[in-house]
Amino acid sequence: MRRRSWVSGLLVLAGCGDAGGGVSTEASTEAAASSGGASGPGGESGAPPTTGGAPTSGSGEDGSSGSTGPAATPGPWEFGVFIPPEPQAPGDPVKGYEALVTRGYITCGIPWLLFGLAKPLLGPYTDGEALPGRSGKNAQVPYNWTVHEVDGAEIVSQNCLTCHAGSFNGQRIVGLGTADEDFTGDMSALLNTFPIPDIPIPGLEQMTRFLNRMKVLGPMTVMRTVGTNPAEAVAITLVAHRDRHTLAWSEEKLIDLPEMVVPSDPPPWWRAHKKNALFYNGMARGDHRGTMMLATALCTDSVAEAQQIDSYFADIQAFVRSVQAPKYPFAIDAGLAAQGEAVFVDNCAGCHGTYAANDVDDTYPNLLFPLDVIGTDAVVAEGGTKYAPALVDWYNESFYGSITRMEPNNPFPGYMAPPLDGVWATGPFLHNGSVPNIELVLDSTKRPKFWRRVDYDSAHFDQAGLGWPFAELMYGHADAEDAEKKFIYDTTQFAHTNTGHTFGDHLTPAERAAVLEYLKTL
């Protein structure tokens, strides 16, 4: 598989979903329904799913979720704080999938009449395969593009699948975060070469608006490493140029915010139906669709326009909450996996939950952990209080904040322990993508300071370590050749550290191998 251009994901804010489900692109809307149907895995549409009676803290008998391990064994779950569920707007997941891949929630882009001419200029990010099940002109564009009408003009815009339809074993999976996007360049430099014709073509107004936004975003969203996502920078930059009450765009910044390179690893959508708070730091509370809708902020220039998008976004959220993790496609040693389940229950389930043959019988404790317990890079957890409190204030006073609250300090800055369904497919790991495989998540002493992926072929998967094949390096960005720098993950850089989650360090190699085998069954 070719790496897709750094241009691609910036056309859609990565806020389009904190987590969700794994649906092969072979799925039609009927398949979307069968993955959870109108009821979804939590029961009645929009109802919070069962979490097995998670306790208000991570300790005590109620924290066992029906197993003997987590309750009987002291562990880090004792320090977790339960985040309670809140009602989600009801929606139709079948209609939601249709809206996700056909509606124009990004209202600026490239005129349909110019899209064919744009491909040679825009390169790899326009050569994705078509999305099965779409018809008409949408069957002629890549899976992460949508042809739609704005004010009578046909334009082509990117959709949420730009960041949320990764590849695994050669198969496109809707809901899997992308791990091969290249955001290491300033996209505005490329887009400045795009010729705008003098003749009147429907959609030129939307294209001009799109190009102007990219000039603002481009310099602020340059990442250091291929595969890391600039979701934090995109969100910060866009809201800094908007009036919080009217959503009107300003060419000048309205909020002074720090310029930081903060990497993010897009989480899978299949976690969404279990989580009571979205984002790695758990700051999105209430009905989650408000923060999901922030993905439309690229071109949403009025509250009326946001309300129109909101008219169908509950359906999109229902789809996100209905889909499920994919099944591990390779062989599994059943005996070793059974041994691993026992180790997992004693050492991991207190934070990450328990897993049954039926998703409805799973348990997930929804625990938020303080930084001094989890120990992972603190920048994202502290972003809303230390680095960008103005962003939180803007959001909570905006239209989006009337739907979803941002609470980065409730009750403290920290990180949620995520559900682990399909975790084997979601590398690299930790919230900033700093650890190449799960084996190293379970053994912090062996994590490389500098590393790079061997290649970007999704069919090349490390079945032993559960991650993408990588090479450890003896040097980082400071000593690398310019052409190689963007492929190196340098954990000495700000917000890129790979510390923390040392909870597997005490396991023996045999126990660790057994847990890895068990995770393949999830």
Indicate where each model-derived feature is located.
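Periplasmic c-type cytochrome electron-transfer domains
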Residues: 69-522
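Ser/Thr-rich, Pro/Gly/Ala-heavy low-complexity intrinsically disordered linkers and tails
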Residues: 13-73
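Sec-dependent bacterial lipoprotein signal peptides
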Residues: 1-14
